[in-house]
Regions:
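Non-transmembrane, aqueous-exposed alpha-helical and coiled segments at domain scale
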Residues: 1-135
Length: 135
């Protein structure tokens, strides 16, 4: 009986984790979306790579460029799906010099876009530490 209860709890936990995966949620939300090109995707946060992979899966024909800013080590499971993306790893939970560099790069990246560019921002937890741009 105890083993069955343990198995049930583990199965429920795995189901809950799968239900909130960033790639799945973003792919589902974006599946009916259409953006006029050129579309530029910016994903920031600890789930940035997962979210970018999800939107890439359903909007790949519309996406011109993707910039991902995430916590160091949080992009590796998604690296294969995001070969074309620019990935920046920065400081979390405390901002670092990398966070300042990420902020500078984000501003430059946006300035480099076409006049008629559309931007899709995907933001998850950790973004306020990962990207800093002092005024």
């Amino acid at each position: 009986m105890v083993k069955n209860n343990r198995y049930l709890v583990l199965e429920l936990a795995q189901h809950a984790i799968n239900a909130v995966r960033g790639d799945r949620l973003v792919a589902q939300a974006a599946s009916d979306a259409h953006f006029e090109p050129p579309l530029h995707v910016v994903a920031i946060g600890k789930a940035a790579a997962a979210m970018a992979a999800g939107v890439q899966r359903v909007l790949h024909k519309q996406i011109r460029r993707t910039l991902i800013i995430t916590k160091r080590g949080h992009n590796s499971p998604w690296s294969k799906a995001l070969r074309q993306a620019e990935i920046i790893q920065a400081g979390h939970p405390i901002p670092t010099r990398e966070s300042l560099a990420a902020g500078e790069r984000l501003l430059q990246w946006m300035e480099d876009a076409e006049q008629d560019a559309r931007f899709l921002f995907l933001i998850s937890g950790g973004a306020s530490s990962l990207v800093e741009a002092p005024v």
